[in-house]
Regions:
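A short, well-structured beta->alpha microelement
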Residues: 29-35
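Right-handed parallel beta-helix/beta-solenoid
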Residues: 36-41, 60-67, 79-80, 86-96, ...
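Bacterial N-terminal signal peptides
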Residues: 7-15
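Positively charged n-region of N-terminal signal peptides that target proteins for export
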Residues: 1-4
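Beta-strand-rich solenoid/repeat architectures in extracellular/passenger domains
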Residues: 21-29, 42-55, 68-83, 99-107, ...
Length: 500
C-alpha cells in the first residue's frame, strides 16, 4: 500500500512540474506552460488569461488536424527570450485561429504555418498578430505540402492523398505587423517553396504593415490566390514592396483601400495571369529610384494575359506609376481614374499584344523630353523587337505639359531602338509641354494615329520622318488644328464624312 501511495504521489509531483499541458482547455489566468495540442482540441484563452512561454512554440499543434484556438487574451513567447513561434502550426490541417487579443513572438514568426493545409486565421478589430522581428505570419508551401514531390511534410492524414490545394484564408480587421516580411508565404528560388489557394482579406480598419523594412506581404511563386484590401484597409511598407508576388500565377489583387511603400508597391515581376483592380489609392514615395509603383510582368515572355483596371489613384513620386515593360503575352489596361508620376506615368516599352483604354487621366508632371511622358512605348534594346498588336484608345486625358515633356513617346532616341505596329485612337486630349506625340525613333514602322470625335492635340505631333498613317475619322465632331512636324513619309487617310 505504501508503494502504491508513493507511486501516486510521485506521479502527481512530476505531472505538476511538466512544461507541456493539454490543449483541450480554457486558460483564464496567467500561464507560463507550453500547450501541446492533439487532433480536434479546442483551446480558449479568456481576456484574463495569457500563455507566456520562455521557449519556442508557446502553443504547439504541429501535424495536428481540426484544432480550434480562440484567443481573447495573450499568447506569446516571453519578452527578452528571443524565442519564436507563439503558435506553431506547421503541417497542420483544418486549423482555425480566432484572435481578439494579442499573439506575439519575441523574435520571428508570431504564427508559423509552413506546409499547413486549409488554415483559417481571423484577426478581429482591436486585435494584434505581431513579431518583434520578421514574419508575424509565416507559411511556406501553405496549401502545397507535397510541392517537393512527396508527402513527407503533409499532415499525417494526407500522407497518401497529398495536398488539399487549399492554403491560408486570412480575415484581418485588426493589426498585423512585423519589422519586415509581415506575412510571408514563399521566397524560394526556382519555385520552392511556394504557396497556393491563399485568400487574404484586409477589411475596413485592418492594417498589415512592416515597421522598418520591406514586404508587408511577400508571396513569391504564389498561385491560384487572391488578395483583397477593402475600403478603409491599409497595407503599409516602411521600405520597398507593399505586395511582393514575383513569379506568381493566376493571382487576383483587388485594392479598394490604401497601399503604400517606398517603391514597387505592387511587384509581380515575371508573373502570369494577373488580374489587378484598383479603386483606392496605391502610391510610392521614393523620389530618386523606382522601377514602377505597380509593376506587373516586366519580363520578355509570353505568359498568360494580365488585366489591369484602375478607377482610383495610382501615383509615383519617381518612376512609372504602372510598369508593364517587356510583356508580350497580352495585357489590357482599363483606366477611368488617375495614373500619375513625376516622370513616366505608364511604361510600356518592348510590349506586344497590349491594349490601353483610357477614360480617365494619365499624367506626368516631369519637365524633360527623355524620361518624362504620359505613356512611353519605348525600346531599351537594339536587338529585341518592340511593338506588335499594340493599341491605345484614348477617351480621356493624357498629358505631360511641363517643360519639354511629351504626352506620348514612341521608340527611343537611338537608331535601332524602334517601336513598331502601334495604333492610337484619340477621341480625348493628348498634351505635351513639347510634343503631344513624338516618334523618338525614325525607324518606327506600322504606326497609325486616328483622330476621332472630340480628339485634341495640345503640342505638335513630331513624326521624325517615320512612315506613319494619320487617319481622320468620320466621327470627328469639331474643327481640328493638328500641328505635324517632320512629316516627309506621312500618309493621310481622309475618312471625313460631312464634317470637313
Amino acid at each position: 500500500m505504501k508503494k502504491i501511495l508513493l507511486s501516486i504521489i510521485l506521479f502527481f509531483l512530476f505531472s505538476s512540474i511538466s512544461y507541456a499541458g493539454p490543449c483541450l482547455t480554457t486558460i483564464a489566468s496567467a500561464s507560463t506552460n507550453q500547450l501541446a495540442c492533439a487532433d480536434d482540441d479546442i483551446l480558449n484563452v479568456t481576456s484574463a488569461g495569457s500563455i507566456t512561454y520562455n521557449d519556442h512554440k508557446a502553443v504547439d499543434l504541429e501535424d495536428e488536424t481540426g484544432v480550434q484556438i480562440t484567443n481573447d487574451g495573450t499568447i506569446e513567447t516571453e519578452d527578452g527570450t528571443n524565442k519564436q513561434k507563439a503558435i506553431h502550426a506547421q503541417s497542420s490541417l483544418n486549423t482555425t485561429i480566432t484572435n481578439n487579443g494579442t499573439i506575439n513572438s519575441d523574435n520571428n514568426e508570431g504564427i508559423y504555418i509552413d506546409y499547413a493545409e486549409n488554415i483559417t486565421i481571423t484577426n478581429n478589430a482591436g486585435a494584434t498578430i505581431s513579431a518583434e522581428a520578421g514574419n508575424a505570419i509565416e507559411g511556406r508551401n501553405v496549401g502545397w505540402c507535397d510541392k517537393a514531390g512527396n508527402n513527407d511534410n503533409c499532415q499525417s492524414s494526407l500522407s497518401s492523398s497529398g495536398s488539399t490545394a487549399v492554403g491560408l484564408i486570412l480575415h484581418n480587421h485588426g493589426m498585423i505587423s512585423a519589422t519586415q516580411g509581415t506575412i510571408l508565404l514563399g521566397t524560394g528560388g526556382g519555385g520552392n517553396p511556394r504557396s497556393r489557394g491563399v485568400k487574404i482579406y484586409n477589411y475596413d480598419g485592418g492594417t498589415i504593415k512592416s515597421t522598418s523594412g520591406n514586404n508587408p506581404i511577400i508571396a513569391k511563386y504564389l498561385t491560384d490566390s487572391e488578395i483583397i484590401n477593402y475600403e478603409g484597409g491599409t497595407i503599409e511598407s516602411a521600405g520597398r514592396y507593399g505586395i511582393l508576388a514575383e513569379n506568381g500565377s493566376n493571382i487576383t489583387i483587388d485594392n479598394r483601400g490604401t497601399i503604400t511603400s517606398d517603391r514597387n508597391t505592387i511587384y509581380c515581376r515575371e508573373c502570369s495571369g494577373v488580374t489587378f483592380t484598383n479603386s483606392g489609392t496605391i502610391s510610392s514615395t521614393n523620389t530618386g529610384t523606382n522601377t514602377g509603383t505597380v509593376l506587373i510582368d516586366r519580363q520578355g515572355d509570353s505568359d498568360d494575359a494580365h488585366t489591369i483596371t484602375n478607377s482610383g489613384t495610382i501615383e509615383s513620386a519617381f518612376g512609372a506609376a504602372i510598369q508593364i515593360a517587356r510583356n508580350t503575352g497580352g495585357t489590357t489596361i482599363d483606366n477611368t481614374g488617375t495614373i500619375k508620376s513625376s516622370t513616366a506615368a505608364i511604361g510600356a516599352g518592348r510590349t506586344k499584344n497590349l491594349t490601353i483604354n483610357n477614360h480617365g487621366t494619365i499624367t506626368s508632371t516631369g519637365e524633360n523630353d527623355t524620361g518624362h511622358f504620359g505613356i512611353g512605348f519605348g525600346n531599351d534594346s537594339t536587338s529585341v523587337e518592340a511593338g506588335e498588336n499594340v493599341v491605345l484608345n484614348n477617351f480621356g486625358t493624357i498629358s505631360a505639359i511641363n517643360g519639354d515633356a511629351d504626352g506620348i513617346k514612341i521608340g527611343d532616341y537611338h537608331a535601332n531602338k524602334n517601336f513598331d505596329d502601334l495604333t492610337i485612337n484619340n477621341s480625348g486630349t493628348i498634351s505635351g509641354g513639347d510634343n503631344s506625340i513624338v516618334m523618338a525613333n525614325s525607324n518606327n514602322t506600322g504606326l497609325e494615329i486616328v483622330t476621332k470625335g472630340e480628339g485634341t492635340y495640345n503640342g505638335e505631333i513630331e513624326l521624325n520622318s517615320t512612315n506613319t498613317t494619320m487617319t481622320l475619322d468620320c466621327s470627328i465632331s469639331k474643327d481640328q488644328k493638328i500641328e505635324i512636324h517632320n512629316k516627309t513619309n506621312m500618309v493621310v487617310t481622309n475618312n471625313l464624312c460631312g464634317n470637313d
